[in-house]
Amino acid sequence: MRVLLQRCYEASVRVEGEIISEIAGGLCLLVGFTHSDTEETVEYMAKKIIGLRVFEDESEKMNISLAERGGAILSVSQFTLYADVSRGKRPSFTKSAPGEKAEGLYNLFNNKLSDAGFIVETGVFGAFMDVKIVNNGPVTIMLDSEEMRK
């Protein structure tokens, strides 16, 4: 499981020209799954994100989590996080989990974040979306469950 976390002032998702979800500030999460991901992987990543201290304290040190600061989450499914560009000119997505599996894990992930008390807005799984993110910092962090559990 990979999550590209971006601290943001605001973020929104449009589908067919209509805004379907938006947040006024917090975290935008681009979320992708691979074949080996499980419910345990989702639980691990949700807990990691919930406690991640990516907001500055009064000393301008990243020492405050979203739970402590307040704010919302915009979670967007992003199978292209598992693109393989090692050969040729066109990305391969064979490392991405099949849609049905990924959708179930994506929904579980969002539910875990919501159950932790966060306002969670989402994109539409599998849809072509226009995602607008106004970064704060910018702070952009890639979380990869396979790398983090080594």
Curated annotation (Swiss-Prot):
This is D-aminoacyl-tRNA deacylase. CDD domains: Dtyr_deacylase. An aminoacyl-tRNA editing enzyme that deacylates mischarged D-aminoacyl-tRNAs. Also deacylates mischarged glycyl-tRNA(Ala), protecting cells against glycine mischarging by AlaRS. Acts via tRNA-based rather than protein-based catalysis; rejects L-amino acids rather than detecting D-amino acids in the active site. By recycling D-aminoacyl-tRNA to D-amino acids and free tRNA molecules, this enzyme counteracts the toxicity associated with the formation of D-aminoacyl-tRNA entities in vivo and helps enforce protein L-homochirality. Its main location: cytoplasm. GO terms for cellular component: cytoplasm. Its EC number is 3.1.1.96. It is found in: Cytoplasm. A motif (Gly-cisPro motif, important for rejection of L-amino acids) lies at residues 137-138. It is an enzyme of class 3 (hydrolase). It catalyses: glycyl-tRNA(Ala) + H2O = tRNA(Ala) + glycine + H(+); a D-aminoacyl-tRNA + H2O = a tRNA + a D-alpha-amino acid + H(+). It comes from Listeria innocua serovar 6a (strain ATCC BAA-680 / CLIP 11262). GO terms for biological process: D-amino acid catabolic process.
